[in-house]
């Protein structure tokens, strides 16, 4: 699937005391509300729609009010996650939590409920970021077991806003 949005790519190097590069984190940020590149949008990805029944598992995880500041240590210096004025310019009332942090909470919920705590068993976690999580929000992950290897899921906040949708996890035996 192709997204017709501009992307800003940033590399952040983590070095030891001697200046030796330990790792390089590469971040991509989509610029919302921009685009206009023309052409066909292209095909959509698979539709992982929750079934019309109660979830088989629900995990609630509380984020911390300072979570974005802590998560910034990963090297993601996007001011959208820390600067209230920048967040307002982007159309938010306050800074938003990193999508990767929200994704991590959801991955942890799947690993906890369907992988016996073994992260090696989570082979694929496919999601669409569809809303925002604010630092201090509760992330509620709802999961439906479709088979031993396939879990359909979605995540929402305590406000009821779906923040990760069209989501599925593939689990190894």
Name each model feature, range by range:
Residues 1, 104-150:
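Hydrophobic beta-strand-centered segment that forms part of the acyl-chain substrate-binding groove
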Residues 1-58, 135-136, 140-173:
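HotDog/MaoC-like acyl-thioester-processing domains
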Residues 27-97, 111:
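Catalytic strand-loop segment that frames the active site of acyl-thioester-processing enzymes
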């Amino acid at each position: 699937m192709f997204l017709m949005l501009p992307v800003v790519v940033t590399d952040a190097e983590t070095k030891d005391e001697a200046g030796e590069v330990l790792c390089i984190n590469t971040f991509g940020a989509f610029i919302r509300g921009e685009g206009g590149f023309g052409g066909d949008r292209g095909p959509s990805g698979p539709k992982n729609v929750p079934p019309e029944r109660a979830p088989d598992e629900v995990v609630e995880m509380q984020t911390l009010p300072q979570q974005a500041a802590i998560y910034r240590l990963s090297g993601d210096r996007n001011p959208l996650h820390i600067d209230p004025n920048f967040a307002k310019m982007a159309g938010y009332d306050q800074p938003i939590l990193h999508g990767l942090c929200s994704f991590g909470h959801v991955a942890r919920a799947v690993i906890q409920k369907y992988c016996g705590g073994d992260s090696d068993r989570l082979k694929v976690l496919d999601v669409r970021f569809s809303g925002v999580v604010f630092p201090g929000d509760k992330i509620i992950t709802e999961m439906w077991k479709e088979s031993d290897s396939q879990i359909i899921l979605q995540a929402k906040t305590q406000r009821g806003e779906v923040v990760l949708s069209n989501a599925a996890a593939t689990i190894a035996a």
